């Protein structure tokens, strides 16, 4: 329910600032306490805040519903202070988690005896078992090859750790010490996030805080909706793009997306995309993912507004086809889904480029995923997991940005690579004009 309580602009800014500060603190906690390189060096982690309805208040969930799959097993009325839930199952979460290495922790926030919000911590984990070290392989053909599936479980019950379930999950990793260190870092971040939200509710009061958070979502939705109607003209635009084969056969895959506007109704249709892949490049798109891609573009017009559930207001309907590469059937493998959703983001920009006459950043290359797996002399696995950012497409006013991801991740520092792994880096540099010299 949306609050009707009026909040003055200064208080709203203070509440907004409290959310920003809390997220920064909790993410720094993960970075400084996690053990695996993919989290502490590559920074593939995040903390998000959700309202009592499960809608994003502030963060980067890409339009995903992070709470419903927990509610399916643990209804909100059964939750208690001190509970913490854990899952990574892409299919049970309906694509809110996109592949098994992405572990999610969810904590309800209780204030004055009721749930007023949820805290969500997430990170990409080093290894969860499966067919290969790192739990990712392009030639994997089913989700069981991608590592241990954790359905939504209550890992902490009113402050008490479910040690039996925890030990089972740790036992299924080739690197249980790293997995334990990383999971405890995320648990700590979720706990700290709860503390900060409770302080915020105590400082401003429940009604004022809820009203402020509701107003922020409404403001973002209003801005995004107005911009989408201003920028997207009447008619239809479509894009088809292709991906390399999945490593199982020589078959190439494509997806097709069509953006349509009829009066004030905007729809996105991807039902003409190819059938699901035989390997692991399938992307199980959540209901809100494609809407969020558009919302992120429109958010640039007023970055003073929080990126939240309001970003989904850009699109009225999204149509996907069950059994396609964007909505694969169980138990299709999903480990290398980043190749698909990164290109899908570029296709969203291509649709907007058609709609705006080219006033959009050009398509970007998919980042390089490198896995070095080897047995050490003692018989233990040595694993180096690296995603190498290749940069962004050209912008209407400047060349593209070099060597960065489409999201929040970073490349490994050269010094770290040489200290952590048995290698010597002879050169670490940007290939001059490898994507073209550009206009600027």
Pin down the residues of each PLM region.
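Glycine/proline-enriched, intrinsically flexible loops and inter-domain linkers
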Residues: 1-81, 86, 90-111, 115-440
